[in-house]
UniProtKB/Swiss-Prot annotation:
InterPro entries: GAF (IPR003018), GAF-like_dom_sf (IPR029016), HATPase_C_sf (IPR036890), His_kinase_dom (IPR005467), Sensor_HK_TwoCompSys (IPR050482), Sig_transdc_His_kin_sub3_dim/P (IPR011712). The modification N-acetylthreonine is found at residue 2. The lineage of its organism: Bacteria, Bacillati, Actinomycetota, Actinomycetes, Mycobacteriales. It catalyses: ATP + protein L-histidine = ADP + protein N-phospho-L-histidine. Its EC number is 2.7.13.3. Its cofactor is Mg(2+); heme. Residues 386-452 are annotated as: Histidine acceptor domain. Changing residue 87 to D: No change in autophosphorylation when NO-bound, loss of autophosphorylation in deoxy or CO-bound state. This is Oxygen sensor histidine kinase response regulator DevS/DosS. It comes from Mycobacterium tuberculosis (strain ATCC 25618 / H37Rv). Changing residue 171 to F: No autophosphorylation when Fe(2+) protein is bound to CO or NO; no change in autophosphorylation of deoxy-protein. No change in auto-oxidation, slightly higher affinity for O(2) and CO.
């Protein structure tokens, strides 16, 4: 209160405590603001430290699966998210890998399948830009969640790039404090995604280097087997096994023309000669028509293909089989056959890199096969040439000299007066005649050795062809030097094949049958059919005859069911030298 322009001393005294109180309030607010700023600075420093630590973690490993899991775990920890996931896709935007965190295995099992790149996830794959949502279900691209999927609301998605190419996306949902993701969260995750891109690229390069090393080793093993003298036809199983291992697939098969010398354009069907994997165990000896568009492109045109579904005509067991690689065995202008690799995984089980690598592997295997086949034929030609030379030498030199010696001894007989000596000279002349006759027989055998191969082939083929009218689909394979099989054993072989095929037609009710004749230290005959299999008790004169023939020849006879499928395998063997 004032009096004559003067301030009342009592009023001044009352204002001083008020000013003091206001000053204290402003100081408290300032201290609180400073404390908040300090906390923000500390929090920012901690988050930066967390980002650096996360970058170090995700770039530390070279295993792709482990690297992806490290990225997801680091991202969820960095922004305090309840759920996290990362997908990796190929150039066709097919999801190849999907790792997740926050969902237990029981829930995953009940959901039944992983995301397929649809909805908001598909949007980020098609348009790789950061996306932050307060309610993911409200987005126009959202298609909802499958049954048993945990509810999710807030969402942050960031593309993972390498050299401006997006090959994956990092997803985070539901901060544990219930708040939406912030601008700072997005910046941090983008920084982590940049490091993740480098880490994934390094892991993929390492994976490709390991795969290429395995490819080199597999190619070397096959070439070594072939060039060491192993029968080329038997190495196809190694080709199928190595193809299975290189691709981590579930099954593989090799199919070749029945006549390897026939031009590819004239081949009507391929014979499945080797399989690896239980899913294809029952189709050995079956044939595949080349009429199908994909198979014809691969075999006739020599173009490797990757398909999401393969339908090989005539093989009902593989109807609508999953992803597959179809690889031509190309070598010097020809295609020796086809390797088919099958996976039970979904689309994208095989990558472009795998197709390229496996096509090169098949080419190298086919080239080694062709070289080995050429070497085998050259060796056979050398043997036949040597036999012709030996036959000529025996005829032109040895027989003539023996004949001259015989004439000389025969001329000396009348001049010898001792009857005992005359008899001994006559016996020697007779022995020389026997030797000459044996040599002539040997010459005939040497000249006929090359025809012997054809004769045995023709006899076996004729024994099988006898049942052509029964509707049985048959294939015959020959492995080894057939010329070393003598006539007696060839007779046995023909009888065994005839009896085995007859049993398959009359008793097994088979529709397909494969005969494999292999000559090594023994003559081995294997007849496989897809019939009813072995009965609980089986008897019959035919089987008894086969067993007796094996015993008389010093060999073995067995009859067993086809492992993992219907049908019977008959094996008969006998040593070459009796």
């Amino acid at each position: 209160m004032t009096t004559g322009g003067l301030v009342d001393e009592n009023d001044g005294a009352a204002m001083r405590p008020l000013r003091h109180t206001l000053s204290q309030l402003r100081l408290h607010e300032l201290l609180v603001e400073v404390q908040d700023r300090v906390e923000q600075i500390v929090e920012g420093r901690d988050r930066l430290d967390g980002l650096v630590e996360a970058m170090l973690v995700v770039t530390a490993g070279l295993d792709l699966e482990a690297t992806l899991r490290a990225i997801v775990h680091s991202a969820t920890s960095l922004v305090d998210a309840r759920y996290g996931a990362m997908e990796v896709h190929d150039r066709q935007h097919r999801v190849l890998h999907f790792v997740y965190e926050g969902i237990d295995e029981e829930t995953v099992r009940r959901i039944g399948h992983l995301p397929k790149g649809l909805g908001v996830i598909g949007l980020l794959i098609e348009d790789p830009k950061p996306l932050r949502l307060d309610d993911v279900s409200a987005h126009p691209a959202s298609i909802g969640f499958p049954p048993y999927h945990p509810p999710m609301r807030t969402f942050l998605g960031v593309p993972v790039r390498v050299r401006d190419e997006s090959f994956g996306t990092l997803y985070l949902t539901d901060k544990t404090n219930g708040q939406p993701f912030s601008d700072d969260d997005e910046v941090l995750v983008q920084a982590l995604a940049a490091a993740a891109g480098i880490a994934v690229a390094n892991a993929r390069l390492y994976q490709q280097a390991k795969a290429r090393q395995s490819w080199i080793e597999a190619t070397r093993d096959i070439a070594t087997e072939l060039l060491s003298g192993t029968e080329p036809a038997t190495v196809f199983r190694l080709v199928a096994a190595e193809a299975l291992k290189l691709t981590a697939a579930d099954a593989a098969l090799v199919a070749v023309p029945v006549d390897e010398d026939m031009p590819a354009a004239d081949v009507g069907e391929l014979l499945v000669i080797e399989t690896v994997g239980s899913a294809v165990a029952s189709i050995v000896g079956r044939t595949i028509p080349v009429a199908g568009a994909v198979l014809r492109e691969v075999f006739v045109n020599g173009i490797p293909r990757r398909v999401d579904r393969v339908d090989l005509e005539g093989l009902d067991e593989l109807a609508d089989a999953g992803p597959a690689l179809l690889l031509p065995l190309r070598a010097r202008g020809t295609v020796a056959g086809v390797v088919v690799v099958l996976s039970q995984g979904g689309p994208g089980a095989f990558t472009d890199e795998q197709l390229e690598m496996m096509a090169a592997f098949a080419d190298q295997a086919a080239l080694a096969w062709q070289l080995a086949t050429s070497q085998r034929r050259m060796r056979e030609l050398d043997v036949l040439t040597d036999r012709d030379r030996i036959a000529r030498d025996l005829h032109d030199h040895v027989i003539q000299r023996l004949f001259a010696i015989g004439l000389a001894l025969q001329g000396a007989v009348p001049h010898e007066r001792n009857p005992e000596v005359q008899q001994r000279l006559s016996d020697v002349v007779d022995d020389l005649q026997d030797v000459i006759q044996e040599i002539r027989t040997t010459i005939y055998d040497l000249h006929g050795a090359s025809q012997g191969i054809t004769r045995l082939r023709q006899r076996i083929d004729a024994a099988v062809a006898q049942f052509a009218d029964s509707g049985l689909r048959t294939s015959v394979q020959f492995v080894g030097p057939l010329s070393v099989v003598d006539s007696a054993l060839a007779d046995q072989a023909e009888a065994v094949v005839r009896e085995a095929v007859s049993n398959a037609v009359r008793h097994a009710k088979a529709s397909t049958l494969t005969v494999r004749v292999k000559v090594d230290d023994d003559l081995c005959i294997e007849v496989t059919d897809n019939g009813r299999g072995l009965p609980d008790e089986f008897t019959g004169s035919g089987l008894t005859n086969l067993r007796q023939r094996a015993e008389q020849a010093g060999g073995e006879f067995t009859l067993a069911s086809v492992p993992g499928a219907s049908g019977t395998v008959l094996r008969w063997s006998a040593p070459l030298s009796q």
